[in-house]
């Protein structure tokens, strides 16, 4: 399974989770959008469709494409969000990384990819990715109840319903 990350060079390279996982051989880091795999699930915080277990086959066959950029600079108009299909957003989760600890929905690239893998039922791979960070296992523990609920949903609509119940929407 491919996990390909377009790196926008907007972060502190010493703290960058995707670069660390690239060095470990877990992520392929690319500098051109043309290098993203066709048909991959594209993590897009602006997508109206949430990641769900129904995306498992797509992830296994085509992989995951993510954008590593500053949350302060990410825009709906970003080229990556215009060039591909299969866009998915993540449902409500809380960050455990030191930069954004406790902030809802402001996940690192590693957290976002691990959450995607967990939700589609690839929990062992999600745990492996998080094991490269001291705080990584805590991300899974902190969000375990939600991740388990999302991973039992049938589809994106059910994931959104679970999220609404949790946050009171």
From Swiss-Prot:
Enzyme class per UniProt: transferase
UniProt subcellular location: Cytoplasm
Organism name: Methanothermobacter thermautotrophicus (strain ATCC 29096 / DSM 1053 / JCM 10044 / NBRC 100330 / Delta H) (Methanobacterium thermoautotrophicum)
Gene Ontology biological process terms from the UniProt entry: enzyme-directed rRNA pseudouridine synthesis
InterPro entries the record matches: Tsr3-like, Tsr3_C
Predominant cellular place of this UniProt entry's protein: cytoplasm
PANTHER family per the UniProt record, alphabetical: 18S RRNA AMINOCARBOXYPROPYLTRANSFERASE, RIBOSOME BIOGENESIS PROTEIN TSR3 HOMOLOG
List of residues binding S-adenosyl-L-methionine: 17, 67, 90, 109
Keywords on record: Cytoplasm, Ribosome biogenesis, rRNA processing, S-adenosyl-L-methionine, Transferase
Role played: Aminocarboxypropyltransferase that catalyzes the aminocarboxypropyl transfer on pseudouridine corresponding to position 914 in M.jannaschii 16S rRNA. It constitutes the last step in biosynthesis of the hypermodified N1-methyl-N3-(3-amino-3-carboxypropyl) pseudouridine (m1acp3-Psi).
Keyword rRNA processing annotated: yes
Family: Belongs to the TDD superfamily. TSR3 family.
Domain of life: Archaea
GO molecular function: 18S rRNA aminocarboxypropyltransferase activity; S-adenosyl-L-methionine binding
EC id: 2.5.1.157
One of the record's GO cellular component terms: cytoplasm
Presence of keyword Transferase: yes
Protein name per UniProt: 16S rRNA aminocarboxypropyltransferase
Reactions mediated catalytically: an N(1)-methylpseudouridine in rRNA + S-adenosyl-L-methionine = N(1)-methyl-N(3)-[(3S)-3-amino-3-carboxypropyl]pseudouridine in rRNA + S-methyl-5'-thioadenosine + H(+)
């Amino acid at each position: 399974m491919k996990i390909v990350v377009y790196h926008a060079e907007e972060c502190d390279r010493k703290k960058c989770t995707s670069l660390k996982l690239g060095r470990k051989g877990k992520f392929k880091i690319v500098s051109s959008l043309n290098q993203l795999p066709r048909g991959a699930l594209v993590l897009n915080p602006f997508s109206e469709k949430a990641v769900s277990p129904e995306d498992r086959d797509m992830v296994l066959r085509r992989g995951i494409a993510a954008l590593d950029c500053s949350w302060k600079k990410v825009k709906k108009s970003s080229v990556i969000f215009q060039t591909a299909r299969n866009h998915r957003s993540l449902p409500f989760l809380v960050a455990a990384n030191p930069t954004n600890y406790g902030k809802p929905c402001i996940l690192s690239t590693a957290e976002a990819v691990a959450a995607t893998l967990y939700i589609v039922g690839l929990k062992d791979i999600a745990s492996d990715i998080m094991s490269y960070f001291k705080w990584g296992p805590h991300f899974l523990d902190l969000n375990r109840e939600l991740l388990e609920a999302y991973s039992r949903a049938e589809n994106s609509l059910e994931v959104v319903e679970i999220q609404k119940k949790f946050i009171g929407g």
